UniProtKB/Swiss-Prot annotation:
Gene3D superfamilies: Medium-chain alcohol dehydrogenases, catalytic domain, NAD(P)-binding Rossmann-like Domain
UniProt GO cellular component terms: cytoplasm
Quaternary assembly: Homotetramer.
Names of the cofactor(s): Zn(2+)
EC number: 1.1.1.1
Residues holding Zn(2+) 1: C46, H69, C156
Designated name of the protein: Alcohol dehydrogenase 1
Reaction(s) catalysed (UniProt annotation): a primary alcohol + NAD(+) = an aldehyde + NADH + H(+); a secondary alcohol + NAD(+) = a ketone + NADH + H(+)
Organism taxonomic ancestry: Eukaryota, Fungi, Dikarya, Ascomycota, Saccharomycotina
First-listed, main subcellular location of the protein, grouped into a coarse class: cytoplasm
Protein family: Belongs to the zinc-containing alcohol dehydrogenase family.
Superkingdom of the organism of origin: Eukaryota
Binding residue positions for NAD(+): G180, A181, G182, G183, G184, L185, G186, D204, K209, V271, G272, L273, R343
C-alpha cells in the first residue's frame, strides 16, 4: 500500500545566506517526469551544508534553500519517465542531484563535473526536509533492509573519501596520511583506507580524537596540538613520508604541510574546501620529488555503488550521533567550533 503524501512537511529553511535557520512547515515538492519523490528518514550533516548556509563559496545557492545532501529514505512517488525504481525502494539523495548526461564529462562517467550539474542542498532543495526530490538516474540505490541512519553519511562523506582514495591510486601496504581524521569525512576515510589495505597515519588534534581514530584502524596518530613540527612527525611515523595524503580538513596550513611531508612520487589529494584557500607548493621540491597534487570531487554512480557495497559488507562503520532535524542549528554551531567526532545524523521525524 502506497504512502499517503501530505501537502506540507517539516523542513529547515533559510531565506538569505547567513540568515536564520527556521524549522517550519514547507510545501512537499512534486517530482518532475525524471524524478523520484523520497520520504527522507535520516540525513547526514556535511561541512558543505555550512558553506551553503554562509554563502562563502564562489557558487551561488538558490534562495530560499533547504540544505542537506546525505538523505536516506524510501521512494514514495515518481515522475512518468522514471525507470528502474518502484515505490518502497530505499533511495539516497547525494550531492549530485542531477546532470545533463550528454556532455563530454557525463559521457565519460564524470557527471559531477557537468556544467549543468544540479546540486542537492545548494541549487536544489536537499535532505533537511521530510520529502525531497532527486533525479532517478543519479539517486543512490540502497539495498533493502539497510539501516538508513547509518548509511546516510556514506552518500556524501563515504563516497567522497572513497573516490579520493581511488584518485590517490595507492597500493596495498602503502602509507596514506589523512588530515582531519577525527571528523565526519576523516573517520570514514580511515576505514575505507584500511579496507583497501592501506596503512594510515591520522592527523588531528587532541587525545580524544587520537583514541577515536586508532579505534577505527589508524596505525599512527599525529596530534597537531602537541607536535611542534607536523611535517617531521608525519615523516617519522611513516618511515620517510606517506605515499599519499588525503586532505579532508578545512585547514589551508594542513594542505601546505601535506605537500611537504609526502615522500618522493607521493600524491596529494585535495578534498576539503576551506573558503578562499590556496595551495602553496615550492616548485623546486615538487619537481625534484615528482609529486602529484590532485583535486578529487564527489564520486560518480559507480563510485557510489562501490562505497555503499563496502558499507553493506560490514567493512565500514559510521560513527554517528542521531539528533532531531530541529536541532540542526546546534549541529552547525558544534561544526564551526570543531567539536564533532564522527558524523551527526538528523532524524527528520523530530
Amino acid at each position: 500500500m502506497s504512502e499517503q503524501i501530505p501537502k506540507t512537511q517539516k523542513a529547515v529553511v533559510f531565506d538569505t545566506n547567513g540568515g536564520q535557520l527556521v524549522y517550519k512547515d514547507y510545501p512537499v515538492p512534486t517530482p518532475k517526469p525524471n524524478e523520484l519523490l523520497i520520504h527522507v528518514k535520516y540525513s547526514g550533516v556535511c561541512h558543505t551544508d555550512l558553506h551553503a548556509r554562509k554563502g562563502d563559496w564562489p557558487l551561488a545557492t538558490k534562495l530560499p534553500l533547504v540544505g542537506g545532501h546525505e538523505g536516506a529514505g524510501v521512494v514514495v512517488g515518481m515522475g512518468e519517465n522514471v525507470k528502474g525504481w518502484k515505490i518502497g525502494d530505499f533511495a539516497g539523495i547525494k550531492w549530485l542531484n542531477g546532470s545533463c548526461m550528454s556532455c563530454e564529462f557525463c559521457q565519460q562517467g564524470a557527471e559531477p563535473n557537468c556544467g549543468e550539474a544540479d546540486l542537492s542542498g545548494y541549487t536544489h532543495d536537499g535532505s533537511f526536509e521530510q520529502y525531497a526530490t532527486a533525479d532517478a538516474v543519479q539517486a543512490a540505490k540502497i539495498p533493502a533492509g539497510t539501516d538508513l541512519a547509518n548509511v546516510a553519511p556514506i552518500l556524501c562523506a563515504g563516497v567522497t573519501v572513497y573516490k579520493a582514495l581511488k584518485t590517490a591510486d595507492l597500493a596495498a601496504g602503502q602509507w596514506v596520511a589523512i588530515s582531519g581524521a577525527g571528523g565526519g569525512l576523516g573517520s570514514l576515510a580511515v576505514q575505507y583506507a584500511r579496507a583497501m589495505g592501506l596503512r594510515v597515519v591520522a592527523i588531528d588534534g587532541g587525545d580524544e580524537k587520537g583514541e577515536f581514530v586508532k579505534s577505527l584502524g589508524a596505525e599512527a596518530y599525529v596530534d597537531f596540538t602537541k607536535d611542534k613540527d607536523i611535517v617531521e612527525a608525519v615523516k617519522k611515523a611513516t618511515d620517510g613520508g606517506p605515499h599519499g595524503a588525503i586532505n579532508v580538513s578545512v585547514s589551508e596550513k594542513a594542505i601546505d604541510q601535506s605537500v611537504e611531508y609526502v615522500r618522493p612520487l607521493g600524491k596529494v589529494v585535495l578534498v576539503g574546501l576551506p573558503a578562499h584557500a590556496k595551495v602553496t607548493a615550492p616548485v623546486f621540491d615538487a619537481v625534484v620529488k615528482s609529486i602529484e597534487i590532485k583535486g578529487s570531487y564527489v564520486g560518480n554512480r559507480k563510485d557510489t555503488a562501490e562505497a555503499i557495497d563496502f558499507f553493506s559488507r560490514g567493512l565500514i562503520k559510521c560513527p554517528i550521533k542521531i539528533v532531531g532535524l530541529s536541532d540542526l542549528p546546534e549541529v552547525f554551531k558544534l561544526m564551526e567550533e570543531g567539536k564533532i567526532l564522527g558524523r551527526y545524523v538528523l532524524d527528520t521525524s523530530k
